[in-house]
Design a protein with these regions (language model features):
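Glycine-rich flexible loops
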Residues: 1-233
Length: 233
């Protein structure tokens, strides 16, 4: 099996996993998407398809330079978001977009997910940030591209890179996560949803809860992700 065919099958499987694992409300409709970068192309879920009736050959193959469809069905409307992230951060090889319940709740509340414990610190070097709200001109002009720009701007403002922050909340929208592989990007989406629920529960149980100390946060992140990482359980 050639690499492109394998990646298409993985994308299809990952999109189905989002549904089966409860990353979306089944009764609401079809939202969320998974993509990967392959050479100078973005392979992404087609727009508005019934995944139960979708074949890997239907996966959209879009040129990153001009967003023109190369093969497959009409691509997801979110393709410009994925494309600008791939072009801005070469280390990103796969992206997952979900509207998972707890993480999207934080996004809709316009609140970054604070780090209250070491589980969060194991995966994120900082809070899980939320982007700024788009203004009316940005929404009307080029909505999806502006979302991508807002993600990049937030990371730059906080002096963070995709290795330090493997995902982000998009204001009033949902979640984008990324990784070096499709499996890693999907795993990071799961992590964000888990720590979003942890933070919600923790703040509910203790209204005066404080964020984890910077020293403990740094220790946990670096022992798992740093150049001298030694974490393992």
């Amino acid at each position: 099996m050639n690499k492109e065919k394998l990646l298409k099958k993985k994308i299809l499987s990952a999109n189905k996993k989002i549904i089966h694992d409860g990353f979306k409300a089944k009764s609401i409709g079809n939202f969320g998407n998974v993509s990967c970068k392959y050479k100078n192309f973005c392979l992404i879920k087609p727009s508005g398809v019934n995944l139960a009736k979708t074949d890997h050959n239907d996966i959209s193959v879009v040129r990153l330079d001009d967003l023109k469809l190369f093969t497959g069905k009409k691509p997801s409307v979110d393709t410009p978001i994925h494309a600008i992230l791939y072009k801005s951060y070469p280390e990103i090889k796969a992206i997952v977009h979900t509207h998972s319940l707890y993480a999207s709740s934080w996004a809709q509340s316009l609140k970054s997910i604070p780090c209250y414990g070491t589980t969060h610190a194991d995966y994120f070097a900082d809070e899980v940030p939320v982007t700024n709200i788009l203004n009316s001109n940005q929404i009307k002009k080029n909505y999806e591209k502006e979302i991508g720009i807002s993600i990049i701007n937030k990371l730059k403002t906080k002096s963070l890179n995709p290795w330090q922050i493997p995902g982000i909340l998009v204001a009033q929208h949902g979640v984008f996560s990324w990784g070096k592989t499709i499996d890693e990007a999907l795993y990071n989406a799961e992590v964000i949803e888990f720590i979003a629920q942890l933070a919600f529960n923790s703040s509910f149980l203790n209204k005066k809860i404080k964020k984890i100390s910077k020293s403990l946060h740094f220790k946990h992140f670096m022992r798992k992700n740093g150049p001298l990482a030694y974490y393992g359980q």
